[in-house]
Amino acid sequence: MVPDSTTILHHSITLNLFSDYHSHPQGHRVQRYTQALLQPWIDSARAKGILDIAFTDHDRYHGGVDFDELDRLRERNPDVRIRAGIELDNDPETSAAGRKWVEQNWKRLDFVLGSVHYLNRADQMFDSVPEGAQQFTGRDIDDVYSDYFRRVREMAASGLIDCLAHLDLVKIHGYRPRAQVTELVEETLELIRARNLAIELSTAGWRKPVNELYPSDEIILFAMEKKIPFTIASDAHSWAQLGENYERLRQKITSFGLREVCVYEKHKRIVRRL
């Protein structure tokens, strides 16, 4: 279901982080989409120069997503490209229902993120702060990383996503493997490339204990070598967090020599130069 074609649009613009492709208007509970809920997100995005935004609530809250309400929001805000999205997770309790919902609504969705938040505990996301750190205590960290990236590959192979979210989320609590992370992630990057998927550059890591961009510099450069495309995102759980730390992200992107990011419309990847 992931498209094969890529449209490239060339724009002569100054480096401008114009998109945010990971946002959660519902937060951490079901809240039915309404204009009152969504319009503040568009107002915040516009004020920050973000004119292409994807709403990607967690799939377990798909009951709150209303495509007709998104159409009304687009009519009210023709200057902002508003994408219908979802974040598909590996939650042991809800992922089956989430995948079914994505399949049923694929044609109405513009963009699907894939993520891994669960390891060996079905009752707790490993990235919960601070309690999730307990899942790393006493374990071989290289084994944890290997297990995590195995689950990421399962998500990448699902055929139901366009992009991988916070690719090295496993580092969130600051635990580091003994092996080079590029060795641990190479098989995953090869699959991402083979499946024609993108990787998200997420500023959310800067507000977590690890205090780093997702993914790491090493992984970004490795992905660039493999010509894997990127989206940019804040993983905002409130409208105030949209575009958070984008100035730091701009500096990173400049240092990497990265000059294009991608956006999506009905799962068609559009590469835009910065």
Feature names for model-found ranges:
Residues 180-242, 259:
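Active-site-adjacent C-terminal substructures of enzyme catalytic domains
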Residues 46, 156-157, 224, 254:
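Non-catalytic positions within long, well-ordered alpha-helices that form the structural scaffold/packing
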Residues 65-195:
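Extended substrate/RNA-proximal surfaces in nucleic-acid metabolism proteins
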Residues 3-92, 96-104, 171-183, 187, ...:
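An N-terminally biased module of ancient metal coordination in phosphate/nucleic-acid-related enzymes
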